């Protein structure tokens, strides 16, 4: 009986401690999210035009995870997992610069994880035009495709900078 009582007491104390911890963690999480919203905020947001994690927009026109620079965009307008890029100095996780974009494409000065170098329409997971570069940048010339597409001009940068035209998983314009 004594062990059963001890077990019940331990259970009560444990559940109380867990509840207190969870409420503190929840408050911290909420305040952290608010800080992030403030830090990453750009006009607009979500999956459309405007903000998201990058400049430009969400997964659609202009941005996504990188709008211009960062995880997917090159330099200039566009970015994200497949949005356009633009002219300029390129960089980020995948997009080069120039007309390309997406996870590897790009023209212009290119760079990053898979962005090519040189000119052309670029795009896709490793396409692009010109001299190629990075972990997936191709060579050749002409208008790529795949997850890439897009157009525009300007310079991007950083984890989220940049703006301009572009498209989501293949859209954009030349």
Swiss-Prot record:
Tissue distribution is: Mostly expressed in immature seed pods, and, to a lower extent, in stems and leaves. Present in phloem and epiderm in leaves, stems, flowers and fruits.
Q: Where, per UniProt, does this protein localize?
A: Vacuole
Report disulfide bridges, numbered on this chain: none
The species this protein was found in:
Arabidopsis thaliana
Record function comment: Involved in organ growth by promoting cell elongation processes.
Q: What is the lineage of its organism?
A: Eukaryota, Viridiplantae, Streptophyta, Embryophyta, Tracheophyta
Q: What is this protein called?
A: Glycine-rich protein 5
Phenotype of gene-disrupted mutants: Reduced organ length (e.g. inflorescence axis and roots).
Q: Sorted alphabetically, which keywords does the UniProt record give?
A: Signal, Vacuole
Q: Which InterPro entries match?
A: Merozoite_Surface_Assoc
Report the main location listed first in the record. other
Which factors induce or repress this protein, as stated in its UniProt record?
Accumulates in response to flooding stress. Induced by salicylic acid (SA) and abscisic acid (ABA). Stimulated by 16-hydroxypalmitic acid (HPA), a major component of cutin.
Would you tell me the Gene Ontology cellular component terms?
plant-type cell wall; plant-type vacuole
Q: What is the residue range of the signal peptide feature?
A: 1-22
Query: What molecular functions are annotated in GO for this chain?
Result: structural constituent of cell wall
GO BP annotations, alphabetical order: positive regulation of cell growth; positive regulation of organ growth; response to abscisic acid; response to flooding; response to salicylic acid
């Amino acid at each position: 009986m004594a062990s059963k009582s001890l077990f019940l007491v331990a259970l009560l104390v444990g559940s109380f401690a867990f509840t207190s911890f969870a409420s503190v963690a929840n408050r911290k999480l909420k305040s952290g999210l608010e800080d992030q919203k403030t830090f990453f905020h750009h006009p607009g947001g979500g999956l459309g035009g405007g903000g998201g994690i990058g400049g430009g927009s969400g997964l659609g026109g202009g941005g996504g995870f990188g709008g211009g620079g960062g995880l997917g965009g090159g330099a200039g307008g566009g970015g994200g997992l497949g949005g356009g890029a633009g002219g300029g100095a390129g960089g980020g996780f995948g997009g080069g610069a120039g007309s390309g974009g997406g996870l590897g494409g790009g023209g212009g000065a290119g760079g990053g994880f898979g962005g090519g170098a040189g000119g052309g329409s670029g795009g896709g997971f490793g396409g692009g035009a010109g001299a190629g570069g990075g972990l997936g940048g191709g060579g050749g010339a002409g208008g790529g495709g795949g997850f890439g597409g897009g157009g525009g001009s300007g310079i991007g940068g950083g984890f989220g900078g940049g703006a301009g035209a572009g498209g989501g998983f293949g859209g954009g314009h030349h």
